[in-house]
């Protein structure tokens, strides 16, 4: 009797709504810190923007440029940084015909972050299957977009001509810059500084590698814990409200994904936070699909607003590249999601890969390493 009575207060605290929601907030914050740590570590290891520029020096045709865009973004962990590098390279004489495939590659490379987050569910086959499918639907949508629009661009210059026309109209309009409006950085910077301080004693690239490892381990822990807590809190009214915000319909999902991504200025963050919801069974891949597409659009709008504030000789080029990114994602959403047959392809591919990957975890890990690192790196070596 005594042991039962003494355990009751602990159980009531652990199951109280307030405790659970505080746990959700804490774990979401730690996931943001973990994703930031992985990104920070990769930037330090690869040399950041300078490293990305060195990678692009190997581009000698559009297909290699595409793969190098994937590799650079996977290493730097920031499509915004890579796109900024591309703008600088174009201003320095890089042909637009090379720059546009690089932007497409950056668009694909940024999807690695939520795929890494899905690996946090790898110990539970059912959770991992749901989480991996929700993450890789982003990969397959962007792959399909590249397969459709890269040939069209090479043959007709669809994106470049459209972007140049719109850039000419927008140039000289009022500044709409969002530079400096990074809402996430002030929140996670203190924690990242603590991690930096803890690994600062390591020599050379050791600190960057340690930061990546800490980030990945933190992701694995937090995603597992968050999945369990979400199963307790996502019931009743809370679940109903979230479904209204994200799962009411395709347009609502796309709008929500766009808005949230513009606010946090990171599609990686937006989509990564949805993965535990998928792993916990709160949403399925089909329901999160439109939200993911909205995140694709949202990250390009941020870059566009920043580009409109650039003046001088690089203004036209900056706007053109930013608009290429916007139009690429807008056209892809309209065409792929608008055509029922095409709409289903990313979902089917993601669910098939997740089913196979949940049965063979090494295959899932090989997919991540192969698509984002090994294949582009091999191509870079081949053309060296």
Residue ranges and their predicted role:
Residues 7-66, 70, 191-254:
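Helix-loop-helix hairpins and the membrane-proximal interhelical loops
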Residues 4, 109-118, 235-260, 264, ...:
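Hydrophobic alpha-helical transmembrane segments of integral membrane proteins
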Residues 24, 28, 57, 69, ...:
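Alpha-helical transmembrane segments of multi-pass membrane proteins, especially transporters
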Residues 43-130, 134-144:
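Early transmembrane hairpin of solute transport permeases
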Residues 73-107, 122, 168-169, 174-176, ...:
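Membrane-interfacial helix-loop connectors
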Residues 21, 29-33, 116-186, 217-224, ...:
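Juxtamembrane and boundary regions of transmembrane helices in multi-pass small-molecule transporters
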